[in-house]
Each structure stands twice: as structure tokens, then as C-alpha cells.
Amino acid sequence: MVVGTSCQPQHGLYLLLLLLALPLRSQANAGCYGIPGMPGLPGTPGKDGHDGLQGPKGEPGIPAIPGTQGPKGQKGEPGMPGHRGKNGPMGTSGSPGDPGPRGPPGEPGEEGRYKQKHQSVFTVTRQTAQYPAANGLVKFNSAITNPQGDYNTNTGKFTCKVPGLYYFVHHTSQTANLCVQLLLNNAKVTSFCDHMSNSKQVSSGGVLLRLQRGDEVWLAVNDYNGMVGTEGSDSVFSGFLLFPD
């Protein structure tokens, strides 16, 4: 068998066969070396592989160095007014303030329910330097006020016209011993005596009496009768109705 002529086919045909049937190279005659083939075409990219396992935790980083504070910024524009908040709890009472100025007079009030329709009042004086008669009635001969005429300066007696509670009082000047008695319908109610220790003295006394219509009240003296009524040494007898029945 002549190898030199049978192992040299045409180059074009051999190249085609080599590309189509590369495995057949192993079946070629061991004594015959073929021409190296052309590089193949690039294959398509493969798929992404699976994620790898989580790696170990790294070492702590180097602490950062704080930076320097920047310059202060400019003041911003005022914001919109906020909504009104809820009322807070009531605070403690403050201290009283100073009194305010006096206000104008108010309107007249309504008439009260109680109105005293009946009145009785008098004040009379005894204007004389002569002593009254011993053991007798004392007349007060000058009226300061006696609008109802309930005290009679001629008789020296007060006559009750309006039943009720009355108050009687006397202030008498004296230049000698004096005992002043208040009588109600000839019955002695009070007696005030004063013994002289100076040239002139004053004696006083008062009493509340409930009177009925027609009752009479007057003043009298006993044998101590040093009552006077002069300028600077007045003797006064007064009475008035407190509460009518």
C-alpha cells in the first residue's frame, strides 16, 4: 500500500469533512497527520450562578473625626400662625385688687314692706331757775319738738295715742340734791337720785315702756328737788315710739 499518494486528498474537501465530522479524526490512519482546523464560533453566554454564602462580619471601621461646626444660618421667614390650643387648667386665685373708684348713685329701691304709719316723738325743756315743788310733778314748759302734741306743756304729762313700745329719757341739771322719778299712771317706775358734790351737776336716766292708748307718763321729784333749767344748765325730757303694736 502506497501511503504517499492516498493520504493527500484535495485540501477543500478535506477541510469540509473535518468541520462536519471531527470525531472521525480518531479513526484516521495513525500514520497520517491532518491540518489543524479553524477556531470554532464563540458560544452563547452562560446563566448566572447561585448566590454564594454570606461572608463573615468585617472588622469595625476607624471612628470618624467630628467635623467643625459650620457658620450660623440666616433667620428664616416667620411661619404661619398656629391653631389655638386647648384651654389650660384654672390657675389659683390672685390676691384682691385695689378698690375701684366709687360708682354713681344707684336707682331708688322699691318701697319696703314695713312702713310706720303711726309716729310719736317729743323733746321738751324746763327753762326756769326755780326748783319744782317738792314731792310734785315737774313741768317742762318749752317744746323743742312735739309734732303730734303728745306731750302737754301745760299739764307736764305725755299721753299715749299709739299703743306700742316707747323709750323715755331725761337729762337734768341741778344745783342741789335731786331725785327724779318717772311715773306711769301714778305708779313710780324709776327713780334716779344724785347728791351734790359740786356747784352744778347733771343727772340722767332712761327706760323702755309698753304703753296702751290713754296711758300717761311724767316726771316728778321728792323732797330732793334741786332741778334747774338755765342757759348752760338745761333740763330735758324726751320720748319716742320704737315699735307700734
Curated annotation (Swiss-Prot):
Signal peptide: 1-28
Domain Collagen-like: 31-112
5-hydroxylysine carried by residues: K75
Keyword Disulfide bond among record annotations: yes
Disulfide pairings: C179-C193
Chain intervals with Pro residues compositional bias: 98-107
Glycan attachment residues as annotated in the record: K75
Domain C1q: from-to ranges: 115-245
Compartments, record wording: Secreted; Cell surface
Keyword set, alphabetical order: Collagen, Complement pathway, Disulfide bond, Glycoprotein, Hydroxylation, Immunity, Innate immunity, Repeat, Secreted, Signal
Record entry for activity regulation: The C1Q subcomplex is inhibited by sulfated molecules, such as triterpenoid sulfates, heparan sulfate, or chondroitin sulfates.
Gene Ontology annotations of biological process type: complement activation, classical pathway; innate immune response; negative regulation of granulocyte differentiation; negative regulation of macrophage differentiation; synapse pruning
Domain of life: Eukaryota
One matching Pfam family: C1q
SUPFAM superfamilies: TNF-like (SSF49842)
One GO CC term, this protein: postsynapse
Residues carrying 4-hydroxyproline: P36, P39, P42, P45, P63, P81, P96, P99, P105
Record flagged with keyword Glycoprotein: yes
Residues covered by region (Disordered): 42-119
Role summary: Core component of the complement C1 complex, a multiprotein complex that initiates the classical pathway of the complement system, a cascade of proteins that leads to phagocytosis and breakdown of pathogens and signaling that strengthens the adaptive immune system.
Domain comment quoted from the record: The C1q domain is the ligand-recognition domain, which specifically recognizes and binds the Fc regions of IgG or IgM immunoglobulins.
Protein name: Complement C1q subcomponent subunit C
Species assigned in the record: Rattus norvegicus (Rat)
